[in-house]
């Protein structure tokens, strides 16, 4: 039974990722006044299937000087971690109802850094290594603010369980009292998932393609899937933390529909940002975090510690 549940989560996520790639190409196309993919199937709807067949039937080439074991483990682990991060998300009921689900997600997103680092190192290519080091520095840096923002929100929530966020937001979205945190969170998720304007890991002008420069075919597709699964997961998490959908246990389907529509809108917003903004310079990226976001989030964290005590007494102990 558990295996069926697991498959019922993995298959839709992979399908969502496949069609997100199509949506991205369509959105970018229309924003640049062109059609995007429109040959394979009606309106190009079968393009993701064609892409998958093409990538997985290609020969998985490996550089002679690479470390073969790590070279294959890195993309596999990247996708495994990306899919595992979905398990504690309440939609409206999580696959694994953990007491520390928020910490679990943070820990897994930190582990995802290793896959990038290993792939860059195992490729034995200078470009890949520089791209990987950039990615690691960026991801680790932005995780600091993500953790502090999560801590601030959990002080209002009273526990590390994501399921209780729906109860917390029954009357008001947390977006409204803590909108500065929401803005910083959204920008940090962009940086955490290596999306434009923070896609410095894939700086074509200086690094050819970033940490996955030596990958082709299947392993490259696994990295691609992991990246997009992370994007949708981060947006789902944003919805759970800031725009909690109303959950009525009589009709849980309503929660799912509400949650899915909001996640889709945020994902489309990610694509819109990619089409609109140029890439940051690396020092600007780090400056934004360490000099702007970190002091602000620390102050906001202190504010969220003080606020419940000032207004109501000690925070809820659930």
From Swiss-Prot:
Enzyme nomenclature, EC number: 7.1.1.2
Iron listed as a keyword: no
GO molecular function: NADH dehydrogenase (ubiquinone) activity
Membrane topology: Multi-pass membrane protein
Keywords: Electron transport, Membrane, Mitochondrion, Mitochondrion inner membrane, NAD, Respiratory chain, Translocase, Transmembrane, Transmembrane helix, Transport, Ubiquinone
Chain segments annotated as transmembrane: 3-23, 69-89, 102-122, 144-164, 171-191, 222-242, 253-273, 294-314
Keyword Magnesium: no
GO cellular component annotations of the record: mitochondrial inner membrane
Catalytic activity: a ubiquinone + NADH + 5 H(+)(in) = a ubiquinol + NAD(+) + 4 H(+)(out)
Subcellular localization(s) per the UniProt record: Mitochondrion inner membrane
Organism superkingdom: Eukaryota
One of the protein's GO biological processes: mitochondrial respiratory chain complex I assembly
UniProt family annotation: Belongs to the complex I subunit 1 family.
Database matches in HAMAP family: NDH1_NuoH (MF_01350)
Record note on quaternary structure: Core subunit of respiratory chain NADH dehydrogenase (Complex I) which is composed of 45 different subunits.
Function: Core subunit of the mitochondrial membrane respiratory chain NADH dehydrogenase (Complex I) which catalyzes electron transfer from NADH through the respiratory chain, using ubiquinone as an electron acceptor. Essential for the catalytic activity and assembly of complex I.
PANTHER family (UniProt xref): NADH DEHYDROGENASE SUBUNIT 1 (PTHR11432), NADH-UBIQUINONE OXIDOREDUCTASE CHAIN 1 (PTHR11432:SF3)
Descriptive protein name: NADH-ubiquinone oxidoreductase chain 1
Organism: Murina suilla (Brown tube-nosed bat)
Lineage summary: Eukaryota, Metazoa, Chordata, Craniata, Vertebrata
